[in-house]
Amino acid sequence: MTRSLKKNPFVAKHLLRKIEKLNTKAEKEIIITWSRASTIIPTMIGHTIAIHNGREHLPVYIIDLMVGHKLGEFSPTINFRGHAKNDNRSRR
């Protein structure tokens, strides 16, 4: 279910503070976060955010097309390696 338009998008406070601090200094550095549920807002455009996928932090450069999506969408947690091979030939 989508979030109500009356409510603001969810962004973790610590993440928002870090981005606003970098915007006032006009600096660009990698921001490390575990907050996959935070929504990407226009003030994040141009920053690189390292999003935790359960094992490591994956750096993601934020562009304007990502606004409105969640950070977790750009950091996959599962690496699909393909289905198991059908091993009927070795059984004969």
Swiss-Prot record:
GO terms for biological process: ribosomal small subunit assembly; translation. Transmembrane segments: none annotated. The keyword RNA-binding applies. One of its GO terms (cellular component) is chloroplast. Keywords: Chloroplast, Plastid, Ribonucleoprotein, Ribosomal protein, RNA-binding, rRNA-binding. The keyword DNA-binding does not apply. It is found in: Plastid, Chloroplast. It holds the Pfam family Ribosomal_S19. SUPFAM superfamilies: Ribosomal protein S19. One of its GO terms (molecular function) is rRNA binding. Protein S19 forms a complex with S13 that binds strongly to the 16S ribosomal RNA. Belongs to the universal ribosomal protein uS19 family. This is Small ribosomal subunit protein uS19c. It comes from Arabidopsis thaliana.
